[in-house]
Amino acid sequence: MTIRLLPPVLVNRIAAGEVVERPASAVKELVENAIDAGASRIDITMTDGGRARILVVDDGRGMDPGELSLAVERHATSKLPGDDLLDIHTLGFRGEALPSIGSVARLTLTSRAAGAGDAWALTVEGGAKGEPEPASHPQGTRVEVRDLFYATPARLKFLKAPRTEQMHAVDVVHRLAMAHPAVGFTLSDGTRQQIRLSGAQGELFEARLTRLGAILGREFSDNAIAIEAEREGIRLTGHAALPTYNKATSAGQYLFVNGRPVRDKLLHGAVRGAYQDVLAHDRNAVLALYLDLPPEMVDVNVHPAKAEVRFRDPGLVRGLIIGALRHALAAAGHRASSTVSLAALGALRPAQGSGAPALPWGAGGYGGGASHPGLEERRSAYAAQAPAGTPDPWAGRGMGAGGGSGQAAMAWLAGAPPAAPRLAGEPEAPPTGAEDFPLGAARGQIHDTYIIAQTRDGVVIVDQHAAHERLVMERMKAALAERGEVARQILLLPEVVELDEPGAVRVATAAAELAKLGLVVEGFGPGAVVVREVPALLGDTDVKGLVADLAEGLAEWGTAQALEDRLGDVVATMACHGSVRAGRRLRIEEMNALLRDMERTPRAGQCNHGRPTYVELRLGDIERLFGRR
């Protein structure tokens, strides 16, 4: 077969196979054209998931008859003032979208240029172009696509159900709306409006957060921290959710480069690196990041649908993202997402039909009026059996601010021994003013695991092990950053730890790196190592358990060389073993010291595995649980 030139219609259909993969692809191209035309409002309507009809109407600059005719010609565009493909300041630049769509569908364009007295319409069917004709239309452009893929029916077999195709279009419009908050968007399926976004006003940073909240939900905007950094001409802005607000997949991660939504593996790798010691391995951060950089530093012409880009210096971009995210997370301090408290409140709400009797809201009981019979019985029984002089814990409205004798009485009622009286010279509970601290004043400990603290307007419940684990880890990281190693303490009796032979070899091979972290180990024959020094921060730790966990981690992380890149994981493992354990009873002053350390420590809102370290319940929410509000 001899080589021949393909006819223009076939060329356009081949291009359409790359550019217009599905109805959402056509929506993307048409909406990008509208944004490039300076539109402040874009309305999209889809019928039958876009198969039957796609309508995009904008109020942009519009086109005159000559431009209208050129717009449907292949590689005709107004967006490249020169011949430099690296000097691109618009979303579109190839001039492929309209001719590609027109080659596989019935396309009608109606447009009126700014300042023009008349509108013009042009039709393209299966690649056959008509002539511009006078029409009626306000300033802007109206693009109607009917019978998508009618000229290439084989493509229709690959489309999903109409609802699925509609959802793909919703995702496309959401991404473009995040990138351009000043533009208003609507998307309808002909019967129901699925997107309605007004153009956000004011400063760009706040406008973006408003738009993100409208799309990702109020929970995201309530739990988002601002990201802002710049390095070597690259500016990074955006918002990232606190680690305790996360998702099971990376679908909640959005990257925009010079206003263009892109999907880039670089983003996911950088985000994972930034969140590695504050997020569980099976959870993913939620964020939207905006990169603004000179056009010559990024190539946007590497993907048919322009969904991917290539950076001239990907290492610089990755470092900027990781550094900015880590700095913002550290600046957030002990803050945890509101979803943690909401989840706790949801678990506390009495379930209708459960075995426990439920009080009607606002009826009797704890707020005055007729008391609950069960409480009256318990109060009478308590008065008859309690030791003489023990105060009535039900007297007044609560147990008292300091959790003193009333607390002891309640402990006795629960079967626990009363709290020992304070000895001479023993520190008193913190003054009432301690409630003004962000995490409040410690009032007690339950199950020797959870610290109960009272704030000015609520209650904080702290997981003492998770919280101390984060404190130890941050101290070790700070020591590494300042001195290059962690202070060590010599064991009076070296500890011999038996492992399987491969595990012992892995630990012994990593001895130099582990020594920087304060753990001095040596090989001790086949299947064993001897530990001579441990990090001083860990105190009295379970050496055998620590080394066993490190051996398992090294099997997952790889060689000792790879260990240098996984120091965060090693430090997290050590911190876990060196922290206050669940089941250890603490004194009030120890609890308060832990709370104050949390307030001063970055990333203290979550442990090294990404779990929350505390839950805060507002007084108003607690009162609603008991029908007081």
From Swiss-Prot:
Gene name in the database record: mutL
Please provide, in alphabetical order, the Gene Ontology terms of the cellular component aspect for this entry. mismatch repair complex
Q: Which cysteines are joined by disulfide bonds?
A: none
Alphabetical list of Pfam families matching this protein = DNA_mis_repair (PF01119), HATPase_c_3 (PF13589), MutL_C (PF08676)
What is this protein's function? Answer: This protein is involved in the repair of mismatches in DNA. It is required for dam-dependent methyl-directed DNA mismatch repair. May act as a 'molecular matchmaker', a protein that promotes the formation of a stable complex between two or more DNA-binding proteins in an ATP-dependent manner without itself being part of a final effector complex.
Keywords linked to the UniProt accession:
DNA damage, DNA repair
The record's section on InterPro entries has: DNA_mismatch_repair_CS, DNA_mismatch_repair_MutL, DNA_mismatch_S5_2-like, HATPase_C_sf, MutL/Mlh/PMS, MutL/Mlh/Pms-like, MutL_C, MutL_C_dimsub
Keyword Signal applies: no
Q: Which PROSITE patterns match?
A: DNA_MISMATCH_REPAIR_1
**Native species:** Rhodospirillum rubrum (strain ATCC 11170 / ATH 1.1.1 / DSM 467 / LMG 4362 / NCIMB 8255 / S1)
Name recorded for this polypeptide: DNA mismatch repair protein MutL
Q: Source organism's superkingdom? A: Bacteria
Q: Which GO terms describe its molecular function?
A: ATP binding; ATP hydrolysis activity; ATP-dependent DNA damage sensor activity; mismatched DNA binding
Q: Name one GO biological process term.
A: mismatch repair
Kinase listed as a keyword: no
Please report which protein family the annotation says this sequence is part of.
Belongs to the DNA mismatch repair MutL/HexB family.
